């Protein structure tokens, strides 16, 4: 319930400093998302290995005839917790850092995370970046925003009050997404695929021009 959520958040805020509250809530939301990914009508049951496949294992979300039902209060939460903790440790290894225990007060490595449109990076000065690493979308191959909604609605419930600027809308923004999505251009007198491709190419051109400015 909403009252229970507020109480639990107040418990965290009373016990930990703000940065740690944000970190703990973020990790808990990732565990919750993984639980939903493994235990929904969109997850596929694989009888050969007696296991379930994640709903997001493919590039689309589809209802399954055969789906798993896992007890959320038993193995599911601990299984997903172990996966998230393992991923965190691997990321720390990748950047040559040690996983931070909850009582660590200071560390000398910092990372800045910003939420912004790739074609309007106003917070980055001209010629101030050494390298830009990106995995851009390719036309209509994957509808990222539609897939993101599967996780976004749960994260918004957990993190909406902690990171309000990241969860301003009920669902993800489909109009500004740089993909070719024909469903946005139906009944316009021109084949929707053609309009979707033009929209995608225009957005990608603006994005790469902005990246060039920053380099």
Question: Model segments located where?
Answer:
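Hydrophobic beta-strand segment of the Class I
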Residues: 132-133
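A short glycine-rich, Lys/Arg-flanked "PGG" loop and its adjoining helix->strand segment in the class I
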Residues: 201-215
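Conserved phosphate/anionic-ligand binding catalytic regions in large, soluble enzymes, centered on
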Residues: 137-138
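Nucleic-acid modification enzymes, centered on SAM-dependent nucleic-acid methyltransferases
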Residues: 1-125, 141-193, 204-207
């Amino acid at each position: 319930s909403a009252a229970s959520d507020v109480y639990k958040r107040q418990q965290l805020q009373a016990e930990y400093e703000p940065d740690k509250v944000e970190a703990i809530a973020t990790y808990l939301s990732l565990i919750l998302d993984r639980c939903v990914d493994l235990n929904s009508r969109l997850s596929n049951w694989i009888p050969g290995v007696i296991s379930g496949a994640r709903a997001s294992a493919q590039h689309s979300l589809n209802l399954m005839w055969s789906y798993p039902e896992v007890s959320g209060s038993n193995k599911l939460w601990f299984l997903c917790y172990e996966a998230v903790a393992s991923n965190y440790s691997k990321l720390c290894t990748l950047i040559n850092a040690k996983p931070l225990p909850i009582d660590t007060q200071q560390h000398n490595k910092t990372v800045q995370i910003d939420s912004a449109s790739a074609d309007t990076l106003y917070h980055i000065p001209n010629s101030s970046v050494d390298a830009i690493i990106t995995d851009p979308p390719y036309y209509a191959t994957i509808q990222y925003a539609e897939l993101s909604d599967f996780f976004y609605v749960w994260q918004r419930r957990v993190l909406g009050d902690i990171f309000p600027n990241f969860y301003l809308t009920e669902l993800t923004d489909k109009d500004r997404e740089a993909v070719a999505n024909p469903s946005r251009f139906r009944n316009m007198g021109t084949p929707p695929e053609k309009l979707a491709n033009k929209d995608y190419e225009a957005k990608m051109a603006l994005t790469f021009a902005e990246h060039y400015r920053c380099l």
